[in-house]
Every structure is written in structure tokens, then in C-alpha cells.
């Protein structure tokens, strides 16, 4: 899968922020297996970019293409199917089900969009230090624990592009490194690309390309 941005910019963003950007109003191509770091200060449209790429919002000008097809040319059913097969995401606001247990949040994703033949939930939870939280309601977990839950959830489905919006903002350095290693391993297994957007560079992300939004 390849993603192209053709002169894309948010309709609400100030012109000076657009003109200084390495993405807005540019011709940008994200290629298969590419590891891309997007460094984006507050107010530059980082979360909007993730939402645009995932097809959640359309308040922008220009075109976003999946494999040469503009996403606004997909009908709703085809777009949903395509996204389930090729895109996974960790949103900045996580979007977990607070009243459900951690395990239930993860099993829903694994069963609805299966990728692994055997459940890796226990293994991934152990690697990220939340194995003792699996049977507790998500809302009782700290925000840092919830970020790790959202990361694991994103890795349980098929994807060729993984979109990450400030995925480590509430993690200490040790847990950031563990999470990044797991993410890179899962992406490599799928020969998938990673687009990681954050406020500042992540030194332990082995990016092929760095773009300043």
C-alpha cells in the first residue's frame, strides 16, 4: 500500500503555519515498509493529519490517495473494509471502552479483525508490563497503562500502515523503548510502514524519514 498527499492542507489552519510546513500544500508520498517520523509542534495540525489519513475527517483541501485512488471516491462500505485490512491507528485520545476489561478491549479487536493465528495478548501485555491489568476495567488503569493497551490493540489486526499520534506521551523512557521495540517488530513482521507523529523527535525510533509538520 502507498499513501499520497496532493496539496493537502487543513481548511482551518493559518497560512503562515501552512507555508512553513513540510507536509501541508506539498506532494508527499508514504511508501510501503517506510518508517516516517513526523515532528509537529502544538497547533500545527498533527492530530488532524492522522484523522485525515485515517479518513475520519474531510475538512481539508487537496487529495489523499490510497494506492492511486482518492479516499473520497470510496463508498462507505468499501472504505471501511479497506481500512480494516490496511490501516491501524493509535489515537491521541485512545478511544478505549472504559467499562470493559483490558482483555475485552483487546479481544474485540483481535476477533473482529484477526491477524495472529494464536492470541498474543498475554505475551504483549507482559512485554509492556500490564499483564496484571488484563482483567481489570480499563477506566481503573492509569493513562500510561491505557496508552500501552491502545498500542497492543493496534497490533492485533492486519495493517500495512500504522498511524501513531503521540503514542508515548505518558510513558517513561524505559516503557517507551519497550513499546517502540514491540511496534517495530510487529510492523516488520507485516512488512508495514509506520507513521509516528509527536511533538518532538523520538530518539529510539529508527526512522527512514523525518518530516517537520
Residue ranges and their predicted role:
Residues 54:
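Helix-to-loop junction immediately C-terminal to a conserved catalytic motif
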Residues 71-88:
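ABC ATPase NBD coupling module
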Residues 93, 99-112:
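Q-loop/switch helix immediately C-terminal to the Walker
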Residues 118-133:
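Conserved ABC ATPase "signature" region
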Amino acid at each position: 500500500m502507498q499513501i499520497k498527499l496532493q496539496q493537502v492542507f487543513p481548511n482551518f489552519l493559518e497560512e503562515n503555519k501552512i507555508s512553513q510546513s513540510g507536509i501541508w500544500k506539498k506532494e508527499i508520498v508514504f511508501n510501503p515498509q517506510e518508517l516516517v517520523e513526523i515532528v509537529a509542534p502544538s497547533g500545527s495540525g498533527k492530530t488532524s493529519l492522522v484523522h485525515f489519513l485515517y479518513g475520519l475527517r474531510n475538512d481539508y483541501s487537496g487529495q489523499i490517495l490510497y494506492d492511486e485512488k482518492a479516499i473520497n471516491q470510496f463508498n462507505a462500505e468499501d472504505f471501511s473494509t479497506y481500512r480494516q485490512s490496511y490501516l491501524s491507528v493509535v489515537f491521541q485520545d485512545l478511544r478505549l471502552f472504559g467499562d470493559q476489561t483490558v482483555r475485552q478491549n483487546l479481544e474485540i479487536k483481535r476477533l473482529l479483525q484477526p491477524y495472529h493465528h494464536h492470541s498474543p495478548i498475554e505475551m504483549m501485555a507482559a512485554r509492556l508490563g500490564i499483564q496484571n491489568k488484563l482483567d481489570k476495567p480499563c477506566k481503573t488503569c492509569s493513562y500510561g497503562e491505557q496508552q500501552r493497551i491502545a498500542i497492543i490493540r493496534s497490533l492485533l489486526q492486519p495493517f500495512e500502515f500504522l498511524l501513531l499520534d503521540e503514542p508515548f506521551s505518558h510513558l517513561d523512557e524505559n516503557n517507551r523503548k519497550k513499546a517502540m521495540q514491540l511496534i517495530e517488530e510487529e510492523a516488520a513482521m507485516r512488512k508495514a510502514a509506520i507513521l509516528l507523529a509527536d511533538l518532538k523527535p523520538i530518539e529510539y525510533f529508527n526512522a527512514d524519514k523525518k518530516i517537520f509538520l
